[in-house]
Amino acid sequence: MILDYRILSIGTLAVHELWERQGEHRTAHATTTLVRSGDRRIVVNPGLPTPVIAARLRERAGLCPEDISDVFLTSFLPDHRRGLAIFPDARWLISENERDMVGGLLIEQFEQEQDEQARDLLREDIALLKRFQAAPDCLAPHADLFPVPGFTPGACGLLLSESNRTVLVAGGAVGTSEHLEKGRVLRHSFDVEQAQVSFTEVLEIADVIVPGYDNVILNNLRSHKIFG
């Protein structure tokens, strides 16, 4: 059985809170990852628009959207799911805690919102979230859920267990390489204290980290395990 992962698209924050020079405001989108294990082909966090996701699949993996068996979101944020519509036949998966807790918050906001346009947007998000199944603990051989709450209420990464190392698709639990270097969580986290706990747990378990809005990072705290 071959376990393989690759980055389809490197994400970016709208405003990088740890950069001195910000430049122009960017459209945020999460890093998108393809995981292949057994008979499953899983896209994690399709944050770019559908035409771009389709192009990245072809360029990076020689695949079509129809080849994807599952889509997994580490968090139910718009910048994690812009490309969802291109995978209508795949299973849409999210952690049960994220689905239930975010669903409750969306319903509460909907009931309190007075603006009709805002209510329509909330209604769409609620309907979209209902399409998601609660992800099983094991999505595929050697690809298991790893809860990282804090960035969002039920944020959950995907832990890939290779023969000599662990790779964690961490989502917003680790924002960027700068956040890892400085030991910081994303400023707009839902629960900063809980996010810091999850951040520490990521460092303890992952040899390689796929962050929420950056390229793959080697965890120097555990690199000795890989190289000697």
Please tell me what each predicted stretch does:
Residues I7-L8, A30-R36, I42, A134-S163:
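Core dinuclear metal-dependent hydrolase active-site scaffold
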Residues V15-T32, S37-D70:
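Pre-active-site segment of Zn-dependent metallo-hydrolases
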Residues I10-T12, P46-L48, F76, N97-E98, ...:
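Active-site metal-binding loops of divalent metal-dependent hydrolases
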Residues M1-D39, E201, I205, L221-G228:
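Zn-dependent metallo-beta-lactamase
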Residues E96-P147, P153-I226:
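Metallo-beta-lactamase
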Residues G47-L128:
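Active-site HxH/HxHxD metal-binding segment of metal-dependent hydrolases
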Residues V35, N45, I68, S75, ...:
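Divalent metal-coordination and catalytic microenvironments
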